[in-house]
Amino acid sequence: MMTSNECQWDKMYKNRSIDGKLNVCGSKIASLRKMVRPRMSQRMLADRLQLAGLDLDKNAISKIEAGQRFVTDIELNAFARLFGVSVDELLGFPET
């Protein structure tokens, strides 16, 4: 049986960022993708990730960039490797 504290915690906890998005790295991923020259489409990004062993399609990329899909640690690591940045940078942490 749950205690009243557990019930209150369940009501307060939301798996979203302050702005309601399901991830904090989507906008950074979109920004990095758009900086690639020649410009990389979401489909091209999905293709490159698939070549690296990560099975994401264009729709998943679109949802990630829009903050409408969670990003796993495995996916985050693959994005960081592909773009040549740190996971911390994708998450918005300052460089040390």
Enumerate the language-model features and the residues they cover.
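Flexible coil/turn residues that form the inter-helical turn or adjacent wing/linker of helix-turn-helix
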Residues: 25, 36-38, 54, 69-72
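Short alpha-helical elements of helix-turn-helix
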Residues: 27, 43, 58-59, 73-76
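Residue-level recognition of specific faces of alpha-helices
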Residues: 28, 60-63, 70, 89
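Short alpha-helical DNA-recognition segment
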Residues: 38-63
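DNA major-groove recognition helix of helix-turn-helix
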Residues: 49, 60, 65, 75, ...
